[in-house]
Amino acid sequence: GVLDAFRKIATVVKNVV
């Protein structure tokens, strides 16, 4: 769902930072 996509993106951003 939308929340899953958002959480996935947030995880990627967190990994990059």
Swiss-Prot record:
Tissue expression remark: Expressed by the skin dorsal glands.
Annotated localization: Secreted
Modified residues (Valine amide): V17
Gene Ontology CC entries for this record: extracellular region
Signal peptide start and end residues: none
Recorded superkingdom: Eukaryota
One Pfam family hit: Antimicrobial_8
Entry keyword set: Amidation, Amphibian defense peptide, Antibiotic, Antimicrobial, Secreted
GO BP terms in the entry: defense response to bacterium
Known role: Shows a medium antibacterial activity against S.aureus and L.mesenteriodes.
Name of protein: Uperin-3.1
Organism: Uperoleia inundata (Floodplain toadlet)
